[in-house]
Amino acid sequence: IKSSAASDVYKRQFLFLGGFLLQGFYEELVFRGFFMISIIRKNTIFVAVMVNSILFGLTHGFNNGFQVLALLNLILFGIFESIYLLKTGNIWGISAIHSMWNFIQGNIYGFNVSGMAQSQSIFIFKISNCEIFSGGTFGLEGSLLTTIVLLSAINMVILYNTALQLQ
């Protein structure tokens, strides 16, 4: 691990954070706030969650290093975000999660985010050649580790809300 701790890096990170906050909010507004809610009006919640999550995954299909595991993980991320929105009714929460997911991967740890390299990060990691764990050129979103994290997150958001309802 190398630290690129020059003060200009931190200034740029602050600007990137603003960009990622806008990007995350925009994607959540479009996919969950518009597509999913529009689909729910004429279909089941299950259909709405799956359709908007698959569309979300497919929009990243032309990104560098895109592969089947990346598509699966992006769909799982869409499912997590959809359930979170349905359980909480809070688009700000899912926007913040989405934005920070991208920002931390790319601008803090230096991983590619959905196949896009970041110009600078606070830390620089040497990625292993084992693409199943590193996600290869797509980044961590194409990793089996991310699949495990997302499946756990989906279960937690379902169980957490259920636990609140039981109280």
Each PLM stretch: what is its role?
Residues A70-I132:
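Functionally important transmembrane alpha-helices
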Residues Y26-V51, I83-N90:
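Membrane-interface helix/loop boundary segments of multi-pass membrane proteins
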Residues I1-A6, Y10:
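Single conserved hydrophobic/aromatic residue that forms the stacking wall/gate
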Residues Q13-F14, L22, F46-V51, L71-L72, S95, C130-L151, ...:
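Hydrophobic alpha-helical transmembrane segments
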Residues F20, T44-G61, L74-I75:
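Small-polar-interrupted transmembrane alpha-helices in polytopic inner-membrane proteins
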Residues Q13-G18, Y26, V30, L71-L76, ...:
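Membrane-embedded alpha-helical segments of multi-pass membrane proteins
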Residues Y160-Q167:
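Juxtamembrane boundary at the C-terminal end of a transmembrane helix
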